[in-house]
Amino acid sequence: MKVRTRIAPSPTGFPHVGTAYIALFNMCFAKQHGGEFILRIEDTDQLRSTPESEKMILDSLRWLGLNWSEGPDVGGPHAPYRQSERMGIYKQYALELVEKGHAFYCFATAEELDQMRAEQQARGETPKYDGRGLKLSQEEVARRLEAGEPHVIRMKVPEEGVCKFNDLLRGEVEIPWAQVDMQVLLKTDGLPTYHLANVVDDHLMEITHVLRGEEWLPSAPKHQLLYQYFGWEMPTLCHMPLLRNPDKSKLSKRKNPTSINYYRDIGVLPEALLNYLGRMGWSMPDEREVFTLQDMMDNFDIQRVSLGGPIFDVEKLNWLNGQWIKGLTPGQLLDRLLTWKSDRSTLEDIAAAIQPRINLLSEAVNWAGFYFNHMPQITAEMFESKKLTQEQVRQSLQFAIWRLESQFTWNNDTVSQTLMDLANQMGIKLRDFMPTFFIAIAGSTSSTPVMQSMVTLGPDLTFARLRHALEIVGAPSKKEVKNWEKLNESLKLPKNEATSEA
């Protein structure tokens, strides 16, 4: 049987380095065994999935040098490769499980389930679906379906015993069935959950090995059960260690930039980033640190993966990138520099921004330098204001990050409107509100128009600079984050509603 692996990203945001990390190991594993690596888009979350995000993911993986033999952009014998284009398939399989007695209808409302969880928590129990749908008679189910009542389809799960499955890195894994919820397979809108779509697609696309992050370990019993219910052979599982911040916490954008595009935009070479991701929990047999993708594929052995959480250290990545840069000829380096900032549209935007401010071409360097720098040189003292308290400065940065992150359209209108609305809702005059952002983005209040600068820099560099500024002035504590999230949401409400909310 030919080895087939896959990466299945969800197009709900910016392309994550964790996606590239898992894709790299899937591709190397497949190539090691003379197999195939495919890409599937898991866009069942129709509210958050966007074509723009999908394009960014595909483009960023291609930029790194990762290639797939089948996918939404190249086609293949198992098309379509977007789950949103396969919706009719999933309902068919969910109904098959109901007919076989492995799944059931549940008509519980969201309010009823919330009350159930609240009562369980009051008794000191872990919130979990109580199986109420299993108690309905066939007649009642038929009557309620006929009446068109909203419902979901849930899978049956054993109440006792232990689920056992093998993992390539961990050996036999045991998880008590009591810890496994009766997972929803088909939602009230008829769309599948990740678990059903994932299992059905992996089977139909003949995936033989599933290499994924260890956060999916608790879901493995559900998937094993679904394979048993359908009578299908389950792929071999391999749960990779998660990338972590230097403090050993799970890699998050709050502590480290996580977008592939960010590292591309600051001048990390694709070979260097791929090289660095290859060193996450894995090493070459000769322990050398600098190696190519081909080197990794030629020497790949999944058993060399260490389960200790690999640390994503930006300083180490920068050092490794330096090794790659030093290995180039001057001519090759020039080619890379020109490619790095060769987008004419972006350069024209920068030229338009600095044009009213310069009399000599040589003055362009001072005005445009911050567009090309990694991060502006800023201090906490630079943010001191006669008009704003330190709390207002901190909150304005954090609220702006949260609000801008929800914008999938990144242009002058959306960025400007977001910041102007925030200033208005915080009760701060725009002329007093904006200096914080000039300093965070450009390192000075004497700069090109900051909202346009944010658009030109793009979301990844903008978020990195805003988070850097927030760290400088004082990032919120966990307790503050919870309070600020509520405050940020209440600010969006009409004043009378916001008052009652508070």
UniProtKB/Swiss-Prot annotation:
CDD domains: GluRS_core. SUPFAM superfamilies: An anticodon-binding domain of class I aminoacyl-tRNA synthetases (SSF48163), Nucleotidylyl transferase (SSF52374). ATP binds at K253. It catalyses: tRNA(Glu) + L-glutamate + ATP = L-glutamyl-tRNA(Glu) + AMP + diphosphate. A motif ('HIGH' region) lies at residues 9-19. One of its GO terms (cellular component) is cytosol. A motif ('KMSKS' region) lies at residues 250-254. InterPro entries: aa-tRNA-synth_I_cd-bd, aa-tRNA-synth_I_codon-bd_sub2, aa-tRNA-synth_I_CS, aa_tRNA-synth_I_cd-bd_sf, Glu-tRNA-ligase_bac/mito, Glu/Gln-tRNA-synth, Glu/Gln-tRNA-synth_Ib_cat-dom, GluQ/Sye. It is an enzyme of class 6 (ligase). Its main location: cytoplasm. Pfam families: Anticodon_2, tRNA-synt_1c. One of its GO terms (biological process) is glutamyl-tRNA aminoacylation. It comes from the Bacteria. HAMAP family: Glu_tRNA_synth_type1 (MF_00022). Belongs to the class-I aminoacyl-tRNA synthetase family. Glutamate--tRNA ligase type 1 subfamily. Monomer. This is Glutamate--tRNA ligase. It comes from Acinetobacter baumannii (strain AYE). The gene is gltX.
